[in-house]
Amino acid sequence: VTVVEHGEHLMSAEDAAVSREIEAVFAEEGIATELGAKVRSAKAKKGGVAVRLADDRDIEGSHLLVATGRRPNTDDLGCEAAGIELDERAFVLTGEHYETSAENVFAVGDASGSPQFTHVAWDDHRLLFDRLMGRTIRARSSRSYPYVAFTDPEVAGVGLNEKRARERSIPYDLATIPFSSLNRAYETGENKGVLRVLVDPGSDRVLGASIVGAQAGELIHCFVVLMEAKATIDAIVNAEFAHPTFAEGVQSVVMALERRSK
């Protein structure tokens, strides 16, 4: 298997430290990666396919999978006739409360331009339902939604990473530990990965977290709850975590903050 990626790293939205963990695993498993590469052409050949890169190198294989992203399936919804405006990518334009340009018409889920995850679409419908029923309204823009790549090991995140924090000039303190430092990881042999957390230096609240490792998709929800509760990292530091568990890593990475380790 060869993965051709035009970005400098796989999973280019992640911090380089996260991407490198997956790249290292791929390399160990014999998966080749062509990073910073562009495809010039692709053609069928006997028994497979050949791809030519911009530097004139050829990659041959039995099958070719092209991943170019998604587009909304709004062509046949009758949006124009209903007076519902779309953006330049054909997503339905919505406001903070999912309202469209047509009175009393709302849009939730993938077509509304929300992050395209099933769990986000589910939460969209809950937020809209609460609003329509006159219940307490949570803010759409301030929610903390997790995401998981079900690779092996898994990659999970919530909130800001270093890349996004720097782009927005948001100050942060960073703590990071290798997944191999967890006793449970050592015992099970699932020791590849890293845990990273960004904390607001003023409020001690979590700005975001990234995890690569076994059960990362489960562990990230510790930070999701912490962020939704607007609690400080003391809630993690003072909690009792069963030993030996992967969840101990959540506490360990927070306690690795420089001001906590002194």
Where in this protein do the model-derived segments appear?
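Conserved beta-strand segments of alpha/beta enzyme cores
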Residues: 32, 58, 85, 171-173
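Short acidic-glycine loop/turn motifs at beta-strand connectors
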Residues: 45-46, 88, 201-203
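FAD-site-proximal beta/loop scaffold in flavoenzymes
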Residues: 58-133
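Glycine/Thr-rich phosphate-binding loops of Rossmann-like dinucleotide-binding domains
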Residues: 11, 73-76, 115, 183-185, ...
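Residue-level signature of catalytic and energy-coupling elements of molecular machines
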Residues: 1, 26, 79, 125, ...
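Rossmann-like dinucleotide-binding cores of NAD(P)H-dependent redox enzymes
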Residues: 1-50, 55, 115-122, 130-164
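Conserved N-terminal phosphate-binding loop of PLP-dependent enzymes in the Aspartate aminotransferase
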Residues: 30, 93, 197-199
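Flexible, glycine-rich terminal cap/loop adjacent to redox cofactors
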Residues: 134, 138, 150-262
